[in-house]
């Protein structure tokens, strides 16, 4: 089944909103998911499904993802980053790890479009640099294993 680009972007934005809510509200993933979807019953199933899957990967692999982001965000600790930027990066890294069939340039481009919508112009450049570096490392690791 092929999912349209607009559908995927909507899912990514929803996953970002859940990650942001969990991060800023210091709430459990279960609580965030339950309350978030209680208010959004009218969304298409494919939008909802991919958003939930992406959120679950980001939540389950959060420590690994945060370490990876900090490694590639030179001179930036996670807590110093803007919350929106931090969670855009988390969502993209979760997609790199949990959905390896999605081309990394697509994930990066989608993340930049989301950053243009929800963050600042400076953040777009920052996110691009971090994700490009993360993608190169993950590709190098994958090549070593094969």
From Swiss-Prot:
InterPro entries assigned to the protein according to its UniProt record, in alphabetical order: NusB-like_sf, NusB_fam, NusB_RsmB_TIM44
Coiled coil: none
GO process annotations (BP): DNA-templated transcription termination; transcription antitermination
Gene Ontology molecular function terms on file: RNA binding
Highest taxon above the source species: Bacteria
An example Gene Ontology CC term for this record: cytosol
Keyword set, alphabetical order: RNA-binding, Transcription, Transcription antitermination, Transcription regulation
Pfam families: NusB (PF01029)
Family indicated by similarity: Belongs to the NusB family.
Primary role: Involved in transcription antitermination. Required for transcription of ribosomal RNA (rRNA) genes. Binds specifically to the boxA antiterminator sequence of the ribosomal RNA (rrn) operons.
Cited NCBIfam families: nusB
Protein name, per record: Transcription antitermination protein NusB
Lineage: Bacteria, Pseudomonadati, Acidobacteriota, Terriglobia, Terriglobales
Encoding gene (name): nusB
């Amino acid at each position: 089944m092929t999912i349209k680009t607009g559908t995927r972007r909507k899912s990514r934005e929803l996953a970002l909103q859940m990650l942001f809510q969990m991060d800023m509200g210091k709430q459990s993933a279960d609580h965030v998911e339950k309350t978030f979807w209680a208010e959004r019953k009218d969304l298409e199933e494919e939008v909802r499904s991919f958003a939930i899957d992406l959120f679950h990967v980001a939540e389950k692999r959060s420590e690994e993802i945060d370490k990876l982001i900090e490694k590639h965000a030179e001179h930036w600790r996670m807590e110093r980053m803007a919350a929106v930027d931090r969670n855009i990066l988390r969502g993209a890294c979760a997609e790199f790890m949990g959905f390896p069939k999605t081309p990394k340039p697509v994930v990066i481009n989608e993340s930049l479009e989301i950053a243009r919508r929800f963050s600042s112009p400076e953040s777009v450049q920052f996110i691009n640099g971090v994700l490009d570096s993360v993608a190169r490392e993950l590709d190098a690791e994958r090549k070593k294993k094969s």
